[in-house]
């Protein structure tokens, strides 16, 4: 893919270079920047799968591509590591609002990376690019988690990343998800219980009609 460096104004190039340098020396928790000195518009990072999620233990390579209209237009995000996730297509394209309708020119690369990391903790099935993953997340969380864990074990194994970021809005949230007891798992368990109760009630009414 061709570089967009020559298409960006000098002050934007300096701005991006400064932010990437800062992120490299002071990265958010669980995120490691892989700087490309030849093309700063190709920002590659490793993201550590958050604890308590089906992605825990995995290291996921992804990249942001800064187009010629950046920062007026959002960057494009792609996972280079295969991942089973509702908001990531089979070719790695990431669907998240901050890369689309919620983008603002003043939002930086750090904000985008933290948002994508949060997406690993809180998937959004309503804007699914992977329809199968979105359907399983809503209808059968255990199967969704099993598929996601398997993909992580096959494609995303690596050494853990170190680093703490007190501004990371996801760091405390991930701790509540351990062992499938987090809000996502509980929500889907509650939905299943309601469906089972409704089915039993319907079956009972049908049985009474036959008497």
UniProtKB/Swiss-Prot annotation:
Active site feature: 95 (glycyl thioester intermediate)
CDD domains for the chain: UBCc_UBE2S
Biased composition range(s): Basic residues: 197-211
Reaction(s) the record says it catalyses: S-ubiquitinyl-[E1 ubiquitin-activating enzyme]-L-cysteine + [E2 ubiquitin-conjugating enzyme]-L-cysteine = [E1 ubiquitin-activating enzyme]-L-cysteine + S-ubiquitinyl-[E2 ubiquitin-conjugating enzyme]-L-cysteine
E.C. number(s) listed in UniProt: 2.3.2.23
Enzyme type, top EC level: transferase
Assigned keywords, A-Z: ATP-binding, Cell cycle, Cell division, Nucleotide-binding, Transferase, Ubl conjugation pathway
Chain intervals for the UniProt region annotation (Disordered): 157-211
Single GO cellular component term: anaphase-promoting complex
A single GO BP: cell division
InterPro entries: Ub_conjugating_enzyme, UBQ-conjugat_E2_core, UBQ-conjugating_AS, UBQ-conjugating_enzyme/RWD
Biological pathway: Protein modification; protein ubiquitination
Annotated GO MF terms: ATP binding; ubiquitin conjugating enzyme activity
Matches recorded under Pfam families: UQ_con
Domain UBC core: from-to ranges: 11-157
Functional summary from the UniProt entry: Catalyzes the covalent attachment of ubiquitin to other proteins. Acts as an essential factor of the anaphase promoting complex/cyclosome (APC/C), a cell cycle-regulated ubiquitin ligase that controls progression through mitosis. Acts by specifically elongating 'Lys-11'-linked polyubiquitin chains initiated by the E2 enzyme ube2c/ubch10 on APC/C substrates, enhancing the degradation of APC/C substrates by the proteasome and promoting mitotic exit.
Family recorded in the similarity comment: Belongs to the ubiquitin-conjugating enzyme family.
Protein name (Swiss-Prot/TrEMBL): Ubiquitin-conjugating enzyme E2 S
Species in which this protein is naturally found: Xenopus tropicalis
Gene that this polypeptide is encoded by: ube2s
